[in-house]
Structure formats: structure tokens, C-alpha cells
From Swiss-Prot:
Keyword set, alphabetical order: Acetylation, DNA-directed RNA polymerase, Isopeptide bond, Nucleus, Transcription, Ubl conjugation
GO cellular component: nucleus; RNA polymerase I complex; RNA polymerase II, core complex; RNA polymerase III complex; RPAP3/R2TP/prefoldin-like complex
GO BP: any one term: transcription by RNA polymerase II
Signal peptide segment: none
Modified residues (N-acetylmethionine): M1
Protein origin, superkingdom: Eukaryota
The protein, known as: DNA-directed RNA polymerases I, II, and III subunit RPABC1
Complex formation: Component of the RNA polymerase I (Pol I), RNA polymerase II (Pol II) and RNA polymerase III (Pol III) complexes consisting of at least 13, 12 and 17 subunits, respectively. Pol I complex consists of a ten-subunit catalytic core composed of POLR1A/RPA1, POLR1B/RPA2, POLR1C/RPAC1, POLR1D/RPAC2, POLR1H/RPA12, POLR2E/RPABC1, POLR2F/RPABC2, POLR2H/RPABC3, POLR2K/RPABC4 and POLR2L/RPABC5; a mobile stalk subunit POLR1F/RPA43 protruding from the core and additional subunits homologous to general transcription factors POLR1E/RPA49 and POLR1G/RPA34.
Organism the protein comes from: Rattus norvegicus (Rat)
InterPro entries, alphabetized: Arch_Rpo5/euc_Rpb5 (IPR014381), RNA_pol_Rpb5_N (IPR005571), RNA_pol_Rpb5_N_sf (IPR036710), RNA_pol_subH/Rpb5_C (IPR000783), RNA_pol_subH/Rpb5_CS (IPR020608), RPB5-like_sf (IPR035913)
Localization in the cell: Nucleus; Nucleus, Nucleolus
Function: DNA-dependent RNA polymerase catalyzes the transcription of DNA into RNA using the four ribonucleoside triphosphates as substrates. Common component of RNA polymerases I, II and III which synthesize ribosomal RNA precursors, mRNA precursors and many functional non-coding RNAs, and small RNAs, such as 5S rRNA and tRNAs, respectively. Pol II is the central component of the basal RNA polymerase II transcription machinery. Pols are composed of mobile elements that move relative to each other.
Linked residues for Glycyl lysine isopeptide (Lys-Gly) (interchain with G-Cter in SUMO2): K81
Example of a GO MF term: DNA-directed RNA polymerase activity
Lineage of origin: Eukaryota, Metazoa, Chordata, Craniata, Vertebrata
């Protein structure tokens, strides 16, 4: 892949990551959300083949709007298939900086032992992997994807009381659903899905993540 194409891909991927962080409630500036390809090149370079940028230069650290101590790393490993050694390096950095959540943007995937290490570290350290291919477009901007809103515990309690339901009676959505992964929705959370409706203006459904 030539430098121009690779620079474009890295810009698109980082832009989606910034939108994802923002949509999860982390503090991202408008400049970062709106960064143009030219601005990306000025900041990071346009010769990936010569290490400008190296993927590690794209690392992101964001703090949550509601709680500045709730921080999240986004790592961009160099190797196409990520091994356990890299995961250990990331975990050590997270321990040193007292950060418990991270996203890892991988080119081709992870080795089985690296994948297993993510499972072993949960729930103390939550590391989510995304294939870079998934981030070339922002799935939530697709016109067929309705708006998803993660509900607070209080909102869920109120919802169940209003409709006299038990949580187990709610319809389900898989934690592996692409939109659920984008928002980092965990098992046991409830998501409100808002669709436009020609008759009712908007049509709201609720899903329990499993």
C-alpha cells in the first residue's frame, strides 16, 4: 500500500476513534473531531513507510466528561497480528498510570494467547480490540443504524416500574453487536433504540445486552 493511501486510512481510523470516544462520553475537542486530512498530515506526517507517522504516534488518552479520573487509552500496535508481549507492555503502562480501560486497534487480529490474556485481565482491566477495517467508517453514521442510547440504572428501574416488567422480559441485543461494541455497552446494561417513524414521529424500543 502506498504512503498516500495508508495516510488516508490512518486519518479515517483515528477520526472514527475520536468520534467513538466522544460518543462514549469522553472529552474530545471539536478540532480533533473535525480534523482534516491536511491537518492530520501536518501533525503526524504523510510517510508511514518511513515511520512518519508510526502507529504508536497515534496513541490517544482521553478522560471522561463526568469523571476526569475515568480515563481510557487507545493503542495502535505496529505489528499486524498482535501477540501477548505487546498486551503485557500495554497492561504495564495502564498499571503505571492507573488506567483500567483501553481500546486496541489491530491490523489483522490477535494471537490466541493475546486474546486469552484480555479475558484473564477482565474485569480489573478492560481491553477491547477493534479491527482497523471496522473503523474506516463510523457505523453509527450509517443511515440505516438508529440512534442508540445507554440507559442509567435509575432510568432502567423507572422503565421497568412503568411497564411492570422484569429485566429478563426485555428483548435482547448481543454484546458483540457492532453498535454495542462501538459504544462499549456491557452485558446487563439496557440500551434505548430510537428509530424515526412515519406515523409516530419516532419509535422507541429497549434491549437488554447479553
Amino acid at each position: 500500500m502506498d504512503d498516500e493511501e495508508e495516510t488516508y486510512r490512518l486519518w479515517k481510523i483515528r477520526k472514527t476513534i475520536m468520534q467513538l470516544c466522544h460518543d462514549r462520553g469522553y472529552l474530545v475537542t471539536q478540532d480533533e473531531l473535525d480534523q482534516t486530512l491536511e491537518e492530520f498530515k501536518a501533525q503526524f506526517g504523510d510517510k508511514p513507510s518511513e515511520g512518519r507517522p508510526r502507529r504508536t504516534d497515534l496513541t490517544v488518552l482521553v478522560a471522561h466528561n463526568d469523571d476526569p479520573t475515568d480515563q481510557m487509552f487507545v493503542f495502535f500496535p505496529e505489528e499486524p497480528k498482535v501477540g501477548i508481549k505487546t498486551i503485557k507492555v500495554y497492561c504495564q503502562r495502564m498499571q503505571e498510570e492507573n488506567i483500567t480501560r483501553a481500546l486496541i486497534v489491530v491490523q489483522q487480529g490477535m494471537t490466541p494467547s493475546a486474546k486469552q490474556s484480555l479475558v484473564d485481565m477482565a474485569p480489573k482491566y478492560v481491553l477491547e480490540q477493534f479491527l482497523q477495517q471496522e473503523l474506516l467508517i463510523n457505523i453509527t453514521e450509517h443511515e440505516l443504524v438508529p440512534e442508540h442510547v445507554v440507559m442509567t440504572k435509575e432510568e432502567v428501574t423507572e422503565l421497568l416500574a412503568r411497564y411492570k416488567l422484569r429485566e429478563s422480559q426485555l428483548p435482547r441485543i448481543q454484546a458483540g453487536d457492532p453498535v454495542a461494541r462501538y459504544f462499549g455497552i456491557k452485558r446487563g446494561q439496557v440500551v434505548k433504540i430510537i428509530r424515526p417513524s412515519e406515523t409516530a414521529g419516532r419509535y422507541i424500543t429497549y434491549r437488554l445486552v447479553q
